[in-house]
């Protein structure tokens, strides 16, 4: 797999982690779970999905219209934030979805801030097979050490966009341009695997998904990622 080399020396590290929470207007109360160091980024609701995105993004034939538009809205919410990062040359960016909850008593910003590799650092999600539709026994669970691990994308991918860290705006630019220039779109976490850049993950996961909230995309959700990048059932 070709990995794009981003020249980190071209960007200036600004000394802080810029923490964004993607949050829908009708779930504004979820922001109470985050302190004032987190910046709210307004999530795009289904009702505001444009026709271009609606047609460009492909979902399975048997999913509901509501689910399809939810996937569209999720993708738009993330990539508009990436565009904001690029336009304003923002570095050291932590992106959370509003159902993310800490798996640690304290958030160790120093460990995350010192991550300055040419890639994306996942702080939560779950391991998945390379192919989206593949038998579970084909899943390769990587051997992980505590802290930051390199993910071999030839064997395993990480799904979900609940929490990830972008060290500089040049990487955000690569992510944005890759997605924008695709002829067709899928759900965002699936597309991110195809961005030509290294993937890393923090183990155990710093953020897991709050199973007390109803998913804004998939109703009656039963499986939630845990700190080991596998699933717990509700």
Language model: regions and residue ranges:
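An acidic/histidine-cluster motif and surrounding catalytic segment
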Residues: 2-6, 10-96, 100-234
